[in-house]
């Protein structure tokens, strides 16, 4: 009988948790380096968080003369102005710093239109005041924090505190790694970036819950198995699902990175990176942290061998940490 195509063998026995010492180092780098990048380099905040005016134009020539456009706009004395190519060679993005009043912001747009004339097509004009931008920063931060707290309560209620700690720590790892990508490549950090981070959190959490659920099932099934071996078994049993899910999503997002255009490039690239780092953290961060949390909580499994007198009691104690 045809049982389908198996891209990954069903009986893999990879010792993932045994490599936790190496994974600690890699995970520490993936957490610390992004924080250093944000501190030293900073994020390239978009108009959503910085405030100001954004004007996207398309010139009639095949290649825009950035020098001429820059000279005309800088001559208006509007404060800090950034002019850069955006996508096609004749697409140009003009960023103007926030003006003191809303009227002055509207006047700045009129002045730009006046100096550029009808030789360009105005494809997009966005204006965000300083008050709105500060509110968006606060709202975006609150959204991420609330999502993390809700996840903590959900995992704690469904499983136990050891699983909740492991899930939150690994998700923080994913978030800092993604923010580090924005800092390293100086991608525009805007509301789409917040949406990408929240999507990555949900996507990565789903994968971790699947593994945690298999760990809970195996805790009831193999009461004498050392915890390290049980975690490896659980990860291997869900490995096919983990890999195939991430690969298919990765392949679905790559066209947006390659040909999706500048408007969604940052979001798509963050999603691709989040898929990769989320798969890594589900295997090499969440499970080892669950092991460490269980041991720190005094709930050690029989890593010392099944013949110890207290083994059965330890098994019952650990199994009680998992709600049915």
Whereabouts are the PLM-identified features?
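A structural signal for conserved, well-ordered secondary-structure elements
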Residues: 1-324
